[in-house]
């Protein structure tokens, strides 16, 4: 179970190429793309993340230095990028708690 506040800001829309501006590979999310990508970046301790083509998520420790290597773009749709276009976000603040319940003697306890 997770409790979190979403704290991020849009940096803008940027071009991308097959030699990705943000290294580390991508993960596809088909629901809650921006939230899912934010959580992935937060869990990995990264400050920047990008979403592309309505389903792809990119994040890496060096993303803040590399996201703009191919220049700014227009045509990112609904904050979720486009074909070879990334909407880039920067995590500003936020707290992420991940915990699990354990059942002990019929009671539930939170394990942090």
Where are the predicted features?
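Peripheral, non-catalytic regulatory segments
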Residues: 1-112
């Amino acid at each position: 179970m997770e409790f979190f506040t979403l704290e991020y800001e849009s940096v803008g829309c940027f071009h991308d190429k097959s030699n990705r501006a943000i290294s580390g590979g991508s993960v596809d999310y088909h629901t809650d793309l921006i939230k899912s990508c934010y959580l992935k970046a937060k869990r990995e301790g990264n400050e920047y993340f990008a979403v592309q083509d309505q389903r792809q998520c990119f994040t890496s420790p060096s993303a803040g230095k590399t996201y703009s290597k191919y220049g700014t773009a227009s045509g990112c749709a609904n904050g979720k990028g486009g074909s070879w276009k990334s909407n880039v976000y920067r995590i500003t603040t936020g707290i992420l708690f991940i915990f699990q319940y354990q059942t002990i003697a019929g009671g539930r306890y939170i394990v942090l």
